[in-house]
Amino acid sequence: MEPIGTTASTGQKCPESGVWKVVGTPSTTAPIAKGNTMPPYAGKAVTWKLIQYA
């Protein structure tokens, strides 16, 4: 398992299923499954941080 706090950028494959939060402001959280492509937020490429396991 990847540790809580792992980061992934828009366009990368999600390294761990769980709840991911956008780093910065504005922010949001989203459940993203391992292997899915990390999505953009508000039309921009962002960095996501794992905050909770699925």
Residue ranges of model-derived segments:
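A charge-rich, low-complexity, intrinsically flexible signal that marks solvent-exposed coils, linkers
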Residues: 1-54
